[in-house]
Amino acid sequence: MNTNESEHVSTSPEDTQENGGNASSSGSLQQISTLREQDRWLPINNVARLMKNTLPPSAKVSKDAKECMQECVSELISFVTSEASDRCAADKRKTINGEDILISLHALGFENYAEVLKIYLAKYRQQQALKNQLMYEQDDEEVP
C-alpha cells in the first residue's frame, strides 16, 4: 500500500452516504482527509515524550519539530509495515510477525536497524517465554 492509497478520499455517492452525507462539501472533504491522515500518525504526545527522553534535560523542542518527527516516524512505520504486509500476502499469510519486519527492514536498506531489532526481538521472546513459564508454574502450585 502506498501513501496515496491511504490518503485517498472518494466522493462517490456510496461514500457520501457512508459519511452521513457530509462528504459533499469541500470543507467536509478537507476535514475527512485530515482526519484520515491524522489517524495514520502516532500520537504527538508519545513522539514528544520519546524525543524528550532522548535529548539532554535542558533541550527544548519546538512544536514544528515534534510535528515533523511525528510525520516522519509514522511514514517510516507505514513504509516498513507495507513491505512486511506484501511479504505476508505473497506467503498467503494474514499476520505480520517480527521476522517479517526484520526482513522488510533489510529489503528497504535499514540493515543497521534490523540487526539491533533482531537482538531486541530475541531478548523479548526470551523474557516472554520466562514469563509464561513462571505463570505456568504458579498455576501448577495452586492446583490441589
Curated annotation (Swiss-Prot):
Location of the region described as Subunit association domain (SAD) in the Swiss-Prot/TrEMBL record: 69-80
Alphabetized InterPro entries for the sequence: CBFA_NFYB_domain, Histone-fold, Transc_fact_NFYB/HAP3, Transcrpt_fac_NFYB/HAP3_CS
Domain of life of the organism encoding this protein: Eukaryota
Subcellular location: Nucleus
DNA-binding region (UniProt annotation): 42-48
Pfam families, A to Z: CBFD_NFYB_HMF
Listed GO MF terms: DNA-binding transcription activator activity, RNA polymerase II-specific; DNA-binding transcription factor activity, RNA polymerase II-specific; protein heterodimerization activity; sequence-specific DNA binding
Record region (Disordered): 1-31
Subunit structure: Component of the CCAT-binding factor (CBF or HAP complex II), which consists of one copy each of HAP2, HAP3, HAP4 and HAP5. The assembly of the HAP2-HAP3-HAP5 heteromer (HAP complex I) occurs in a one-step pathway and its binding to DNA is a prerequisite for the association of HAP4.
Misc remark: Present with 2510 molecules/cell in log phase SD medium.
Protein family membership: Belongs to the NFYB/HAP3 subunit family.
Name of this chain's protein: Transcriptional activator HAP3
Organism: Saccharomyces cerevisiae (strain ATCC 204508 / S288c) (Baker's yeast)
Lineage: Eukaryota, Fungi, Dikarya, Ascomycota, Saccharomycotina
